[in-house]
């Protein structure tokens, strides 16, 4: 199988729908605690896929995971209005820990792609608790935040998002760090391009844009109750990069023994994504304030990971 989303909820269904029309993806299996829901989603998505690539989409069980290239874990409670991703930890940790155990029994060599929040904690649990190699336990991390950053910049500058190279690092959440110092458009530093184009970006606008990116999910959920298509698109894009061995660069989250003096954390940094999962992360040059913010973000996640591991051990 190419990809097996675990959970046929809003995010899993959106990801599966997009994967069904992704070049190179021919086989998708949905696994859910509610088999009828998974079967219904699989049939509906399969009918849509028949218009294009005709990828095979079906409902299955953990036994069907054997040989899967990628297993995408989206199961868990969703973010409620006013709730932070880290506050979801206690609700989702036991669910994802149990799923991870079942997946590894059936497919010990698969790549685990986590989309369940808090998405930066789950890869660390897989590495520290289940011994998964860091490059094969991947969180979608700040992939979506980076896209939101580029989208916001592209609208302001009136250029295509594909011409904007800008990344968000750290936590997929409130402590994330927008990398202004390394952002470029057309080979020019972002702020130089903005100035020359007559659309300058001053400190006040930077703060506004950063807040827009950071709170995008909260606004979406306040309006429609769920954020699913953006993250579904990220999942599909990452799976495509893995299955196709693209070696494309994305800001995903992986477990790090040490970062900027912080031990045993898991944050988003640029990684090369291909058939074997995620490469060793790359730490880009940082301005002093960006380094300070990234260190603080890494510390928040290190403490959360330690607390999550302790909670699982206490329940054992």
Predicted regions and their residues:
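Conserved S-adenosyl-L-methionine
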Residues: 21-27, 131-134
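Conserved N-terminal Rossmann-fold NAD(P) cofactor-binding segment
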Residues: 27-69, 83, 302, 306-313
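Glycine-rich Rossmann-fold phosphate-binding loop(s) that bind the pyrophosphate
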Residues: 8-9
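C-terminal substrate-binding/catalytic lobe of Rossmann-fold NAD(P)-dependent dehydrogenases
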Residues: 130-136, 145-316
């Amino acid at each position: 199988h190419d990809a097996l989303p675990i959970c046929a909820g809003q995010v899993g269904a959106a990801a599966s729908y997009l994967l069904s029309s992704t070049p190179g993806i021919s086989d998708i299996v949905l696994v859910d605690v509610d088999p009828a829901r998974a079967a219904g989603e699989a049939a509906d998505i399969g009918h849509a896929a028949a218009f294009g690539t005709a990828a095979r989409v079906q409902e299955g069980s953990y036994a069907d995971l054997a040989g899967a290239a990628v297993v995408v874990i989206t199961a868990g409670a969703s973010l409620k209005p006013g709730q932070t991703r880290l506050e979801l930890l206690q609700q989702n940790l036991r669910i994802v820990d149990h799923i991870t155990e079942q997946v590894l029994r059936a497919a010990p060599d698969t790549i685990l792609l986590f989309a369940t929040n808090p998405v930066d904690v789950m890869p660390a649990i897989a590495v520290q608790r289940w011994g998964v190699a860091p490059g094969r336990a991947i969180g979608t991390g700040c992939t979506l935040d980076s896209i939101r950053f580029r989208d916001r910049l592209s609208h302001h500058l009136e250029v295509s998002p594909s011409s904007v190279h800008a990344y968000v690092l750290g936590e997929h959440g409130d402590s994330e760090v927008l990398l202004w110092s390394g952002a470029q458009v057309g080979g020019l530093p972002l702020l130089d391009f903005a100035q020359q184009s007559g659309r300058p970006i001053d400190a006040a606008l930077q703060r506004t844009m950063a807040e827009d990116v950071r709170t995008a999910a909260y606004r979406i959920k306040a309006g429609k109750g769920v954020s699913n298509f953006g993250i579904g698109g990220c999942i599909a894009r990452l799976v495509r990069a893995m299955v196709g061995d693209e070696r494309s660069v994305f800001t995903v989250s992986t477990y790090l023994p040490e970062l900027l003096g912080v031990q045993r954390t898991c944050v988003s940094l640029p990684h090369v994504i291909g058939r074997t999962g995620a490469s060793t992360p790359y730490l880009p040059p940082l301005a002093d304030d960006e380094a300070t913010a990234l260190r603080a973000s890494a510390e928040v996640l290190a403490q959360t990971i330690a607390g999550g591991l302790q909670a699982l051990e206490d329940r054992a």
